[in-house]
Amino acid sequence: MLVFLFVDGLGLTNDLRSPLKRLHLPTLGALTGGFSQVPLSRPSLAYRVLDARLGVEGLPQSASGQTALLTGQNASRLLGHHQGPHPLRKLQALLQQESLQVWAVQRGLRVLHANGYRPEYLEKVLGSHRNLLSAFAFAARAAGLKLLPVGHPRAVLPAFWPEPEAAGERFAQIAQQYDLTFLENWSLDYWGHRLSTMLDKCLVELDRFLQGFLNANLALTLVLAADHGNAEEPWHTQHTLNPVPLAVYGPLAHLVPAMRSLTDLAPWIKRLF
């Protein structure tokens, strides 16, 4: 059973001003070798450092980066530029054809998009003529998965957990009922664009959420991945050119090959099943 925790806007840097260096983040630190920029492999842990630029000029963006993660295709090169925040027509078609969610459902796997959404948000995005969904949520709908409202028994808040450890443990318990579970955390990128002190709080909450997830001690393999940098440099409001972390922890971690790009993840996940 694989659990894909996507963290929007988490890059890597050696700058000592970064919250990745300033804050006490023991769980994230353990999963990433202290936010290292050097890959490592340990029992039950594979850590890789991924290029988010994809050979295309400009700052990496969410829609193209997430599409690359989910399809294994270089979405930015396909377009000739990076695209964000929401996937437009060409990327929508790619997600409909090749995303992990669509592929997994077609193979008969049990798949869950675990994010819980406010009812008013669901009404807005599902009633819009334009796509207002992220690549992860768009791919979920393309696969026929429901976008769950907050309060649904299988829905998980993507951030802002009142009790992060308990939320992480609950997420693990839900995920053990599925072959492939997705959760999209967008809080770091959101606050990273706003020069907000909330960013530190959200990083600590994410660390505690992961601690609760791992302490559940279930036979799950966690995949933690990001699409582009942002939160690691909170002294400005833009995305960064920095590489991003990929951490795989659990029974399947020993099967992770060398990976260097966002496009390397989806093909490996498909080979697992």
Sequence positions of predicted segments:
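Active-site-proximal segments of metal-dependent phosphoesterases and phosphodiesterases across multiple
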Residues: Y190-R208
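Short, hydrophobic/amphipathic alpha-helical packing segments
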Residues: L94-Q101, G168, L203-L214, A266
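Active-site nucleophile/metal-coordination loop of metallo-enzymes that catalyze phosphate/sulfate
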Residues: G11-W103, P119-H129, Y249-H254, A258-L262, ...
